[in-house]
Regions:
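S-adenosyl-L-methionine-dependent methyltransferase catalytic core, i.e., the SAM/SAH-binding region
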Residues: 1-307
Length: 307
């Protein structure tokens, strides 16, 4: 079986779950099963649940994890929707890798790559909204909003204007064409491709990625898991900021108003602790093998046993 994707921070992810008890491990972003297979191998007492919205990834992982079929079950859907509905107990570990898989990036027909002849970017091929819809149907103001807020594109107004101007004559039908628009208005020669942040913004909009992460964090907070480890891998500042801020909230003992003269709460409102003070990043050795791991940041959190 040819493996189409190298899991990032594999050793670091596996190590983050050391000491978890018997129970269910949930891989919220199953992808091509790299992290899940190693977890099943290293932790023989866990049961596995895999979630993904990509049919191709689910089929591949079903085959790849077949030797563990008696310990594994797979669900299609978004993790923000499925995790809150799981009845399996106890859940002792949750993993989410928010990155786009190498196969999704490399398969031209998926429309994620700069030189794709299609304009799609859907992680779930059955979803209604695609990059084509965003680029050709959104107002200039809405395009400005997503380019600014989801891509942090400095010249977001200029890029939005260029898109609207280009589609006025004929629809923008390929990622390749969209890339050329970016190249025509954005400076070149930087560390990343000029179209990178524009593509990021559109992909986030198409797949509701930030809303999904918020939904996952809400589910983790509201389900009152006990002695559970959560490991989350982000790939850009917007994702990492959401995770970092939520972990900070979860470790806060005092919830009194910042202007209060004295503390009137019980000062025991923390629900766990972060397992490292800073995010874990790829080693030099991993970067040589898998350059796409350069942006990956792993943050882990352990909920209190008496929560």
């Amino acid at each position: 079986m040819k493996i189409p994707h190298i899991p990032v921070l594999l050793k670091e992810v596996i190590d983050s779950f050391k000491g978890v008890g018997d129970g269910y491990f949930v891989d919220c972003t199953l992808g091509y099963g790299g992290h899940s297979k190693e977890m099943l191998k290293q932790y023989p007492n866990i049961q596995h649940i895999g979630i993904d919205r990509d049919d191709e990834a689910l089929e591949f992982s079903k085959d790849r994890l077949s030797q563990y079929s008696h310990r594994s079950r797979l669900y299609k859907g978004t993790f923000a929707n499925i995790l809150p509905t799981l009845e399996e107990s106890p859940i002792v570990g949750v993993l989410a890798d928010f990155g786009v898989s190498s196969l999704q990036l490399d398969k031209k027909e998926r429309g994620f790559a700069f030189d794709s002849d299609t304009l799609d970017m859907r992680m779930d091929a059955s979803a209604k909204l695609s990059a084509y819809n965003v680029v050709n149907e959104y107002s200039k103001e809405r395009l400005e909003y997503i380019l600014d807020n989801y891509g942090e594109v400095r010249a977001y107004k200029r890029v939005a204007s260029a898109i609207v101007e280009a589609r006025a004559s004929s629809p923008i039908s390929s990622a390749k064409e969209l890339t050329q628009i970016a190249l025509s208005v954005l400076p070149q020669g930087g560390k990343i491709h000029p179209a990178t942040l524009m593509f990021q913004a559109i992909r986030i909009e198409v797949n509701s990625e930030l809303q999904e992460i918020e939904g996952l964090l809400d589910a983790l907070e509201n389900r009152h898991y006990k002695d559970e480890v959560v490991s989350l891998i982000s790939f850009h500042s917007l994702e990492d900021r959401l995770v970092k801020n939520r972990f900070k909230k979860w470790t806060k003992k005092c919830i009194c108003d910042s202007h209060a003269i004295r503390c009137t709460c019980s000062r025991d409102n923390d629900i766990g602790k972060a397992l490292s003070s800073k995010p874990i990043v790829a080693s030099k050795e991993e970067l040589k093998i898998n350059p796409r791991s350069r942006s990956a940041k792993l943050r882990s959190f352990r909920f209190n046993a008496n929560r």
